[in-house]
């Protein structure tokens, strides 16, 4: 018989980190813990307050329900938590963890065997120019070859100057640059800003305008000189038919898939 419980854990940022939605000081997460016949499994339900579609008053109640009904099995529980994507990914992790020889090794791969690293981007948080410039230097010194810069909260001209300073020293062959606007641009100004950004050999921009403006986003994706990646646009669209229709309307160059959010 499987037993389940959960724990809340608050992660504290070493440095308050800025996005166009505000300053982040803490990150709330929930751990789902399963046990059976002396074995255990752990899954993380990574809720993002203010962003996740399942940031709702009954979130903890749903976790309690999941724990009380864990014997229903993974497939039924996933169907019953379709509006709680962060709980779904926690469930998947927890069951895989329970079934694995090592609870913290869900899949055997070159990464888990310490044979190969996974390339990730170095995230540059928003802040004043000096703060962002210090982060850029630090990430490059750490060996990152792809930087993703949050934009949209400070003066656009300053952000452009930062991108220009990187490109002055590092070519596109040396450093890949991506930007994430988190929906900060107004539809009326977005295309012009994308044209300016495209001068700096960027890989792509995430979510230039707020989600929900399908026609405006579709027009941007059609006319943009800079590839667009949908991010927040995918949050809360649970029905497969609706997801397909949205992508057919917008026709983005890329999509960002975050298991805790979609």
Regions found by a protein language model. Name each.
Residues 154-262:
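Catalytic core of soluble alpha/beta enzymes
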């Amino acid at each position: 018989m499987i037993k389940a419980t959960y724990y809340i854990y608050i992660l504290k940022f070493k440095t308050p980190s800025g996005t166009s939605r505000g300053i982040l000081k803490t990150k709330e997460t929930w751990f789902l813990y399963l046990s059976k016949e002396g074995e255990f499994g752990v899954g993380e339900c990574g809720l993002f307050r203010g962003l996740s579609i399942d940031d709702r008053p009954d979130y903890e109640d749903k976790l309690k329900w999941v724990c009380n009904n864990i014997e229903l099995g993974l497939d039924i529980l996933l169907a019953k938590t379709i509006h709680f994507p962060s709980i779904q990914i926690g469930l998947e992790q927890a069951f895989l963890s329970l079934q694995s020889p090592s609870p913290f090794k869900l899949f055997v791969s070159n990464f888990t065997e310490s044979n190969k690293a996974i390339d990730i981007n170095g995230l540059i948080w928003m802040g004043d120019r000096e703060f962002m410039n210090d982060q850029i230097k630090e990430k490059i010194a750490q060996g990152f070859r792809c930087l993703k810069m949050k934009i949209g909260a400070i003066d656009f001209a300053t952000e452009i100057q930062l991108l220009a300073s990187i490109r002055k020293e590092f070519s596109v062959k040396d450093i890949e640059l991506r930007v994430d606007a988190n929906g900060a641009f107004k539809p009326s100004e977005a295309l012009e800003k994308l044209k300016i950004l495209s001068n700096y050999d960027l890989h792509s921009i995430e979510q230039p305008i707020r989600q929900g403006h399908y026609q405006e986003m579709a027009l941007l994706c059609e006319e943009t000189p800079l590839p667009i990646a949908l991010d927040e646009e995918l949050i809360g669209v649970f029905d497969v038919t609706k997801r397909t229709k949205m992508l057919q309307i917008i026709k983005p160059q890329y999509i960002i898939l975050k298991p805790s959010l979609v």
